[in-house]
Amino acid sequence: MDQGMADELARLAPLLSGRIGRTIVLVGLMGAGKSCVGRRLAARLGLDFVDSDAEFEAASGSSISDYFARFGEAAFREGERKVIARLLDGPPVVLATGGGAFVDPTTRERIKAAGTSVWIRADLELLLKRTVGRDHRPLLKQGDPREILGRLMEARYPIYAEADIIVESTDEVPEATVIRVMEGLITYLDLEKTV
């Protein structure tokens, strides 16, 4: 991270200080950078970072891959729904969700009611670069990753577009995306205050 980026992060953080009254929920496809960006964003905002997948694994006592294999996607989504609802009932945090969480209508409505959603959008090539060869991506084990991600983008991007804030994730340092999220939050909170 260069000095200009560090200065911009330092400038933006006070503009959000004391203004975060709801959980910031990061949504998007696997590999978009939700966890990486979320950790850095939480540190800048003085909030805890929570990964809904890690919370699911802790609650179920099983990895998501194993849970998927044993019980299927429908059972996983039901458990994920409960975990996210519990997290939204707590104090504000930065919450990174699994790629399919926001697609679930019940989860999406709960996020809209109790959180501020941020879609971290990335193009196919970047998603492939970040996900191929990782063992913890059960959906990518079902065929050609390019084809699977392309189908997921086609099906999910129109739903992700319902998020309160949309930012691009590019192949640059994560802090660049953190800056875009912080700018989006400032604009969103300013607009929310005037409505």
Swiss-Prot record:
Substrate binds at D53, R77, G99, R156. GO terms for biological process: amino acid biosynthetic process; aromatic amino acid family biosynthetic process; chorismate biosynthetic process. Belongs to the shikimate kinase family. The lineage of its organism: Bacteria, Pseudomonadati, Pseudomonadota, Alphaproteobacteria, Rhodospirillales. Catalyzes the specific phosphorylation of the 3-hydroxyl group of shikimic acid using ATP as a cosubstrate. Its main location: cytoplasm. It catalyses: shikimate + ATP = 3-phosphoshikimate + ADP + H(+). One of its GO terms (cellular component) is cytosol. ATP binds at G31, A32, G33, K34, S35, C36, R137. This is Shikimate kinase. Its cofactor is Mg(2+). It comes from the Bacteria. Pathway: Metabolic intermediate biosynthesis; chorismate biosynthesis; chorismate from D-erythrose 4-phosphate and phosphoenolpyruvate: step 5/7. CDD domains: SK (cd00464). Transmembrane segments: none annotated. One of its GO terms (molecular function) is magnesium ion binding. Monomer. HAMAP family: Shikimate_kinase (MF_00109).
